[in-house]
From Swiss-Prot:
The modification Phosphoserine is found at S6, S14. It is found in: Nucleus. It comes from Mus musculus (Mouse). Its main location: nucleus. This is Protein SAAL1. InterPro entries: ARM-like (IPR011989), ARM-type_fold (IPR016024), Synovial_Prolif_Regulator (IPR052464). It comes from the Eukaryota. The modification Phosphothreonine is found at T387. GO terms for cellular component: nucleoplasm. Gene3D superfamilies: Leucine-rich Repeat Variant (1.25.10.10). Signal peptide: none annotated. The keyword Phosphoprotein applies.
Amino acid sequence: MDRNPSPPPPTCGSEDEEDLGGGDRIGSTVYSKHWLFGVLSGLIQIVTPESGTSGSADEEEQADLAEEMENEICRVWDMSMDEDVALFLQEFKAPDIFMGVLAKSPCPRLREICVGILGNMACFREICESISKNEDHGQVLLQCLCDSDPPTLLETCRLLLTCLSQTEVASVWVRRIREHPSVYANVCFIMSSSTNVDLLVKVGEVVDKLFDLDEKLMLEWIRKGATRLPGQPHEDSEEQPVFSIVPCVLEAAKQVRSENLEGLDVYMRILQLLTTVDDGVQAIVQCPDTGNDTWRLLFDLVCHEFCQPDDPPVILQEQKTVLASVFSVLSAISASRAEQEHLKIEEGDLPLIDSLIRVLQNMEHCQKKPENPSESDTEEPTICGPTQDDFHMKILKDISCEFLSNIFQVLTKEKVAQGLKEGQLSKQKCSCAFQSLLPLYGPAVEDFVKVVREVDEALADDLEDSFPSVKAQT
């Protein structure tokens, strides 16, 4: 079934109409309490079969969901988005029934629907708090991350993300996840092996939220992957694999890259969060394979995919958050080049300069106000828009400028000559860069101009004439 069926008509005849006119309605809806009781009773019967009917044949039968029952429980799934229905389900202790299904039923579709209903109910604060503070419920839901059914995993992650987004109970879930060791392994397994883009995006959002909420948990997950050195053999072939968080994040990012920009944004943000702690940076750069894999993926994104020369400048509005994360991680890796000789990143300096300057050029274009106010009605008024106060655009500019200044400081005479020859550097591009870098990064600009002078004295003079503050100190 491709989608959840719509709820049925609330009445089937005159008698039903009379019932709904009385006390059978759920809140202000047209849904019937009696009908809902019947569906929930059917659920109870599914997970508590009569004695004497157990056996392999019965288990196989339980693994399949009758079409009529599936239709009815799917209607409940749709209905549970209504607050009155959700509160009624809570009052009737439906979460206990759904938890019983999750604990006992082998039917993947039924498990998916039950978690989905709980996810809808958790969108309402009172219900979310009730579900979250029940330790038994919490353990059952975390155990669902062991499920092999992608739709069930997707709904489980959606439910967890909903709960983690509620400030009143977020800490409860963080503590519970830290105490539940299988969560890390299950999440890493999904990221490293799943090809389901929707699932990868949602599990990425859960990891992103967890790392944002609790740095200690992030550090624990980073260190879990360091329990076995790269290339260390398994002494016991039956031993469970030890996952490292960075390769798992990279694999998931590669899967979602071409299909879901928002999902890629999530995984780049996870990498950026990892670089906010030294252990996270080391987890990326210490292992040659991981460091170089990370660099290659991110370098390819910014140099060959995002903000390309033939893209309209306004594309920056769509890509600003993912670009900020990518440049931030690349900058952290680049800063480790002296200590990590195995990182093969020097050849990327000139293409990165080209990409960074293009981002700054596009940013300048987006921030320009039309000379003729009437033009704003005809030339992309809402796409570009005023971005001076755009928080994310400012973050991108700050990160880009810091990264560019760092690259300028390590450029050799040979690299500058190559850049001038190949076009990554020019008077126009350098001027654009200086406008963004000065005055904050004055020393880096001064050092760069000194190197330029060794290669092209005329260009250095032109740049100093255009930017007197640089000339005064060189």
